[in-house]
From Swiss-Prot:
Optimum pH is 8.2. Changing S212P: In CEP; no residual activity. GO terms for biological process: cellular response to amine stimulus; cellular response to arsenic-containing substance; heme A biosynthetic process; heme B biosynthetic process; heme biosynthetic process; heme O biosynthetic process; protoporphyrinogen IX biosynthetic process; response to platinum ion. Transmembrane segments: none annotated. This is Uroporphyrinogen-III synthase. Changing T103A: Slightly affects enzymatic activity. Gene3D superfamilies: 3.40.50.10090. The gene is Mgu. Ubiquitous. Pfam families: HEM4 (PF02602). GO terms for molecular function: folic acid binding; uroporphyrinogen-III synthase activity. Monomer. Belongs to the uroporphyrinogen-III synthase family.
Amino acid sequence: MKVLLLKDAKEDDCGQDPYIRELGLYGLEATLIPVLSFEFLSLPSFSEKLSHPEDYGGLIFTSPRAVEAAELCLEQNNKTEVWERSLKEKWNAKSVYVVGNATASLVSKIGLDTEGETCGNAEKLAEYICSRESSALPLLFPCGNLKREILPKALKDKGIAMESITVYQTVAHPGIQGNLNSYYSQQGVPASITFFSPSGLTYSLKHIQELSGDNIDQIKFAAIGPTTARALAAQGLPVSCTAESPTPQALATGIRKALQPHGCC
């Protein structure tokens, strides 16, 4: 059974995308099509902030792209040596909060110790931070242009200072239409389509509706989390599956249940 995932491929240590591998364990043939591209912004300013950990109570990373922005800052400004020598240790003396295991893995690669990765989404991370944070200094939050206000609002309501800096913007992947056309012409209508963000839904839904035609009612739509599920529902699409956590294992389990007769998760 063929399933379509609207995300870019990420190879793990085994040289395979973990989503393809996990779905394959259930006999599902997954194809990945990227729908988003990212452009980095304000890196000199972000680099300067990373150079002054004494000004902040800690860091918040809620997306892999924000971590990539930090990596670029270190590479482009010849800060790798000073990062390894002193900055990394100073940041590790503070809290580094993250959402999800994928983001946590990237943060650990630049030498930072993380906490909160099991929270899974911004709402739960906000609760976690509020239960622990006592520093009078602001938390530094590198984010994208489409960031939601749940985390900033929750922290503000609890009197926890936070300083946001937009370090990337989300744009449509230039190959969306062509890649979807190729997929449908070669594979036909998939049994399931998974969306990984509201913006990914925005950029791809029209093409999917046109290509699926009357067969769109046969597709089981899945979401990686509650925010994306709400975006699907707002477009009038039935959500057959919302992953219990943003992991390949949880999504594969959910899709398998949704594709079983009368299945729903």
